[in-house]
Design a protein with these regions (language model features):
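Conserved, single-site charged/polar hotspot
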Residues: 1-196
């Protein structure tokens, strides 16, 4: 509990990552989804739709590739974005978007693009770097870790509960944040999303 109150990140093995902060975000002390757990994706295309059942790892990797195609995101910025992608997806595995219709999440919610993975080998490397690290709210819930593109060269609002992809890239590039964890604290600490 002390770790969570001080905003420390831990791996699934309990190892500390990052440093203490005054913020109250995010920590993993629960069973995390297995790479082979299933994501039921409502895939909209050409006016039609179908439900695809995908492995969790394959899904989040394809979303990372689809959300951030530029190499400027490689490294710490993409790692922060990957943490948001994983937490957001996990939230909808626990609270499906439409369980009655048989799906957890939709292509209108996340940019699922498996064909883009091969464009940049850093997509896989950056996801593997945060493979066993997760976020929880201050109260231990898996929260809806919202994220959007945001504007170039702007960090956006801190404690908003919504990570800006371009904001992460900007803060890392100018040295405002040195690690993905600092980006995550910037957006999620003491926000409505992470306090619940």
């Amino acid at each position: 509990m002390e770790d969570r109150r001080n905003g420390i990140f831990r791996t699934s093995n309990g190892e500390l990552i990052g440093t203490k902060t005054s913020g109250r975000a995010v920590l993993n002390e629960r069973t995390i989804p297995k790479d082979t757990d299933k994501v039921r994706l409502m895939n909209y295309f050409n006016g039609g739709s179908n439900i695809e059942v995908l492995n969790f790892w394959n899904y989040i990797l394809a979303v990372s590739a689809g959300e951030c195609r530029g190499k400027e995101f490689d490294g710490e910025a993409r790692k922060a974005i990957n943490m948001a992608i994983k937490t957001y997806t996990w939230h909808f595995l626990l609270v499906p978007k439409n369980d009655a219709m048989g799906y957890d999440i939709t292509t209108k919610m996340q940019a699922y693009a498996p064909s883009y993975i091969s464009e940049n080998k850093k997509v896989t490397e950056d996801m593997e770097a945060v493979h066993n690290v997760w976020m929880e709210s201050y109260k231990g819930a898996i929260f809806e870790a919202n994220y959007v593109a945001g504007s170039k060269n702007s960090a956006g609002k801190s404690k908003s509960g919504r990570l800006l992809q371009n904001g992460c890239e900007y803060m890392i590039r100018i040295g405002r944040c040195a690690t993905c964890y600092e980006c995550l604290h910037y957006y999620y600490d003491n926000s409505k999303a992470s306090n619940g």
